[in-house]
Design a protein with these regions (language model features):
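Short, structured surface patches at the beginning of a domain
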Residues: 1-135
Length: 135
């Protein structure tokens, strides 16, 4: 059973931006036949990594309440590359698959940026999936 969390964050207090992210990710979840069990909506700066929503996401991962996380962009985690990498490593440690809604193609672990980041992590099995519903 695939238990999926949708994580949406914006720095501005725009409900429209959060609604757009959630709607897009619900569509992606449907397209991928994923069971969305949690939707986390957060309005906070990407520079702050002590956010209630991000903390909730990590708690769900640690407690093995989710298997997959969907987000529209990797920068929804945050704006500090090293801290983002630490979050990715923590998700990987708990066996969580991260699916990022991206461009026009579906790329599974072939992203040059992720290959570069993997050189700095002790977890060579780190997998981030970049996906799109565009065919």
């Amino acid at each position: 059973m695939n238990r999926t969390a949708i994580y949406a964050r914006t720095a501005s207090p725009s409900e429209t931006a959060l609604d757009w992210q959630v709607q897009a990710l619900q569509g992606l979840a449907s397209y991928l036949s994923l069971n969305v069990t949690h939707i986390i909506r957060e309005t906070a700066s990407g520079l702050d990594f002590e956010r209630p929503g991000l903390n909730k996401l990590m708690c769900l991962a640690k407690q093995h309440e989710i298997d997959t996380v969907l987000m529209t962009n990797l920068n929804r985690i945050g704006r500090d590359a090293l801290k983002v990498l630490a979050v990715l490593e923590e998700l990987e440690k708990h066996g969580i698959k991260l699916i990022i809604q991206g461009g026009d193609t579906v790329e599974v672990a072939d992203n040059p940026l992720l290959k570069y980041l993997r050189r700095f992590t002790p977890h060579p099995s780190l997998e981030v999936v970049l996906a799109s519903t565009t065919e």
